[in-house]
Swiss-Prot record:
HAMAP family: Non_canon_purine_NTPase
Protein name, as recorded: dITP/XTP pyrophosphatase
Subunit structure: Homodimer.
Residues reported to bind Mg(2+): D71
Domain of life: Bacteria
Gene3D superfamilies named in the record: 3.90.950.10
PANTHER family, A to Z: INOSINE TRIPHOSPHATE PYROPHOSPHATASE, INOSINE TRIPHOSPHATE PYROPHOSPHATASE/HAM1 PROTEIN
Active site: D71 (proton acceptor)
Species assigned in the record: Bdellovibrio bacteriovorus (strain ATCC 15356 / DSM 50701 / NCIMB 9529 / HD100)
Family annotation (SUPFAM superfamilies): ITPase-like
Residues reported in the UniProt entry to bind substrate: T7, G8, N9, K10, G11, K12, A72, F154, G155, Y156, D157, K177, H182, R183
Task performed by this protein: Pyrophosphatase that catalyzes the hydrolysis of nucleoside triphosphates to their monophosphate derivatives, with a high preference for the non-canonical purine nucleotides XTP (xanthosine triphosphate), dITP (deoxyinosine triphosphate) and ITP. Seems to function as a house-cleaning enzyme that removes non-canonical purine nucleotides from the nucleotide pool, thus preventing their incorporation into DNA/RNA and avoiding chromosomal lesions.
Pfam families in UniProt: Ham1p_like (PF01725)
GO CC list: cytosol
Amino acid sequence: MELWIATGNKGKLAEYKQLLRELPDLKVFSQGDIASFTPRPEDGKTFEDNARIKAKTLRAVKNNVWVLGEDAGLVVEGLNGLPGIHSARYAGPKASDSENVSKLLKMITLRPMPNKNAKFVCTTVVYTPTGEEWVFNGEMKGTIASKPAGLHGFGYDPVFIPEGQTQTLAELGTGYKSLLSHRAMALKAFLEKLQTVNP
C-alpha cells in the first residue's frame, strides 16, 4: 500500500515515518518525491480547510492511491488561540522555528497576566484510492514554558510542556511524542479506520 503525505516539512515527514515504521507493507511518499509539484497557498480559515487544500492538491497529481493532508498548530489560550493556523508562519512567511518560538514567548510576556495554557491541534484529511474523504483530529494539552529547552522534535516542541509533565516535548524525545502527540492521535484514528476497510 502506498501512502502519499502532502507535506514539504522534513520534520513532519520524519515524524510520520517514525509513527508508521511498524507497518512493513506501507510505503510512505511525500510531495517532495514529485519533481514538478507546486503546493497551493494554505489560505483556509481552519486546520481542516488547510489540510483539505494540501490533500486535494496532491491528489490532483497522485490519484488512485492513499493521500493524506494535514494541518497542525499550537493554540494558546492567553493569545486568543494564536498562533493557530498561522503557527508555521507566526513570525513571518519565511520564519524559522526559533523565530516563531521567540515571537510566541514575547507575545505571552506582553500580557499583564499571562495565561500559558495551550494545546497542539492536528487535523488530517485522507483521500482513499476511490476518492472518499476521511477526516481525523488529534490534540495534546499542555502549557508554554518560559524558555526553550531540549534538542528533539521541531516547531514549538522546545517550549511545549505536555499535561502531567515537567519537561518540554523537545526534552521528552521522539518516543514520548510518537505515543501521545496530537499527530499520533490523529494518525491512530486513521489507522483504526483503515483496519476496518483493509483488514
